[in-house]
UniProtKB/Swiss-Prot annotation:
It holds the Pfam family Ribosomal_S3Ae. One of its GO terms (molecular function) is RNA binding. This is Small ribosomal subunit protein eS1. HAMAP family: Ribosomal_eS1_euk.
């Protein structure tokens, strides 16, 4: 028999011994996700993040997280085909304060609108809001039969399609350019822009199912906490605090000296 180590008596026990399993969730915390004040339901859910450890701060891991929420959950409504994207911009305590980051229609709604025997008209435009957000809006609309029409198809001529597309771009630009982001989101919730386009294009060719189908956020201005707090309905309290910090100048007569205190 070859002379060597007795492997069974080696130090440290078995080589393949199992390590003690640590539950990764024991190092994580739950944070509440808060939607801006323009929505009816503010508390939209919870999110997990690893606790602050050394240089790795928990709030940094939360900032920039994007949550996609159905409008039905935000407005406590039955109409559920619009999805809003909300991005975490700041963390206060256990609350993640979010801001608008985009909008989309659900796939099933989009597929249910596309049919035969009609023309689909699409347009997109890049617009800047008054408070410096650059948005790209996509619009979609479909031609419909006139009231007294017998023919099965309702196809628009190319010239009419171009006119409708031009009208779509004009209305989207006008509605966004003259408002700030909060007002734009308030218009996207009931989709008043789509209804305006439908009305304006009736004279060119009757349309139905006109929607702003998507909104992308292209550029944002520099982050300001005050503006985010305003969106969350806490602007007045935070505004006062910042205003009072500067202090007020006290009027004093020339050569004024404070009185000498007898005891300190």
């Amino acid at each position: 028999m070859a002379v060597g180590k007795n492997k069974r008596l080696t130090k440290g026990g078995k080589k393949g011994a199992k390590k003690k399993v640590v539950d990764p969730f024991s190092k994580k915390d739950w944070y509440d996700v808060k939607a801006p004040a323009m929505f009816n339901i503010r508390n939209i859910g919870k999110t997990l993040v690893t606790r602050t450890q050394g240089t790795k701060i928990a709030s940094d891991g939360l900032k920039g997280r994007v949550f996609e929420v159905s409008l039905a959950d935000l407005q406590n409504d039955e109409v559920a085909f619009r999805k809003f994207k909300l991005i975490t911009e700041d963390v206060q305590g256990k609350n993640c304060l979010t801001n608008f980051h985009g909008m989309d229609l659900t796939r099933d709604k989009m597929c249910s609108m596309v049919k035969k025997w009609q023309t689909m008209i699409e347009a997109h435009v890049d617009v800047k809001t008054t408070d410096g957000y650059l948005l790209r809006l996509f619009c979609v609309g479909f031609t419909k039969k006139r009231n007294n029409q017998i023919r099965k198809t309702s196809y628009a001529q190319h010239q009419q399609v171009r006119q409708i597309r031009k009208k779509m771009m004009e209305i989207m630009t006008r509605e966004v350019q003259t408002n700030d982001l909060k007002e734009v989101v308030n218009k996207l919730i009931p989709d008043s822009i789509g209804k305006d386009i439908e009305k304006a294009c009736q004279s060119i060719y009757p349309l139905h199912d006109v929607f702003v189908r998507k909104v992308k956020m292209l550029k944002k201005p520099k982050f300001e906490l005050g503006k985010l707090m305003e969106l969350h309905g806490e602007g007045s309290s935070s505004g006062k605090a910042t205003g009072d910090e500067t202090g007020a100048k006290v009027e004093r007569a020339d050569g004024y000296e404070p009185p000498v205190q007898e005891s300190v």
